[in-house]
């Protein structure tokens, strides 16, 4: 009888590694499987078509309620690189579909988002809501909106102009464009441990930039000032020039729908105390709910995961994207929509 060959330690170790890799791969697949069905649609926009994704719940029967999403600042495709999928799923648990689109000029969408005003963005949301009301899979009597960051200068106008919204949800919304910019500048310098003379220099530079904006300076004049190194692009300067006077204060008394304001206590972009005070003073009584997320960042993510260059954040984004958000945030979305979106 031939003796059996012994399996060496190297092969055992290799087998263990393969099992672990397979298990990790299966885990990642499961964690990135969301209870929504994504359908690509084109919406007739006010200036150009909107290339959008309609995320429909995979469970239950239609027609569905609908949440229209409004992006924050910066380049954004319909899913915000996948960050919206846990949010879509949270709305799906309440029986609601979600609708979001590539910003103009992103992923082949026509136009250029840097050529837009906040009113232009509000008009896009209105167009999307009107389009959705004619869709057979959408219940035209159950509509809501969700917006993050810069979306806070977009959606209150929509919520004041329309009578067909069941709710509005805002995350990390600011009040005044210029005050928000200064708060963010101070917070970033504080995080860097910058000395006082550096802060003073940056505030003087900012004041000079604001003077140019108030004078309506063209791009060549801005470049000649040499205030920024590197300077903004021509399109970005135009975007700031178009929007730097944004202030939501006058819009808040016109809001006529239940509103959930979500604020992170570690938001370094927005002065959440100012935002909460303005909304409590402005939104009509009985319509506002404020939720402050402990350990929450500007985007309602866990602060420790939402910092530039965070390896833990990247791993969580890939392996467990729902866990990026502060525990309870996604459930709050579901619960608020269930309560007000029936």
Set out the residue ranges of the language-model regions.
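Short beta-strand/loop motif that positions the catalytic acidic residue
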Residues: 255, 261-263
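Primarily recognizes the serine-hydrolase "nucleophile elbow" in alpha/beta-hydrolase
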Residues: 131-191
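The serine-hydrolase catalytic nucleophile loop
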Residues: 76-87, 103, 273
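Conserved alpha/beta-hydrolase
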Residues: 88-108
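Short beta-strand element of the alpha/beta-hydrolase
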Residues: 63-72
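N-terminal cap/lid segment of alpha/beta-hydrolase-fold proteins
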Residues: 27-62
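Accessory cap/linker subdomain of secreted extracellular hydrolases
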Residues: 169-251
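Alpha/beta-hydrolase active-site loop
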Residues: 115-136
């Amino acid at each position: 009888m031939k003796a059996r060959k012994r399996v060496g330690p190297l092969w055992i170790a290799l087998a263990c590694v393969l099992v672990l890799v397979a298990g990790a791969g299966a885990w990642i697949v499961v964690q990135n499987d969301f209870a929504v069905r994504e359908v690509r649609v084109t919406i007739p926009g006010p200036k150009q078509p909107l290339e959008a994704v309609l995320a429909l719940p995979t469970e239950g029967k239609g027609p569905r309620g609908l949440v229209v999403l409004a992006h924050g600042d910066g380049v954004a495709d319909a899913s915000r690189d996948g960050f919206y999928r846990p949010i879509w799923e949270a709305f799906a648990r309440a029986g609601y579909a979600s609708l979001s689109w590539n910003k103009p000029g992103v992923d082949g969408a026509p136009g250029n988002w840097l050529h837009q005003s906040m009113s232009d963005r509000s008009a896009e949301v209105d167009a999307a809501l009107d389009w959705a009301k004619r869709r057979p899979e959408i219940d035209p009597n159950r509509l809501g909106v969700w917006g993050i960051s810069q979306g806070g200068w977009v959606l209150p106008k929509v919520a004041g102009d329309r009578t067909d919204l069941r709710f509005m949800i805002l995350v990390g919304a600011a009040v005044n464009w210029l005050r928000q910019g200064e708060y963010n500048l101070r917070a970033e310098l504080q995080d860097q441990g910058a000395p006082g003379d550096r802060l003073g220099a940056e505030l003087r530079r900012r004041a000079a930039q604001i003077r140019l904006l108030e004078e309506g300076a063209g791009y060549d004049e801005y470049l000649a000032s040499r205030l920024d190194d590197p300077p903004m692009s021509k399109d970005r300067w135009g975007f700031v020039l178009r929007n730097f006077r944004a202030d939501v204060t006058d819009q808040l008394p016109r809001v006529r729908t239940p509103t959930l304001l979500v604020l992170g206590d570690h938001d370094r972009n927005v002065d959440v105390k100012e935002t909460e005070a303005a909304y409590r003073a402005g939104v009509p009584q009985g319509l506002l709910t404020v939720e402050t997320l402990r350990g929450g960042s500007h985007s309602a993510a866990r602060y420790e995961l939402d910092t530039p260059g965070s390896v833990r954040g990247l791993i969580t984004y890939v392996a467990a994207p729902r866990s990026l958000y502060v525990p309870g945030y996604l459930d709050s979305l579901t619960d608020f929509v269930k309560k007000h979106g029936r």
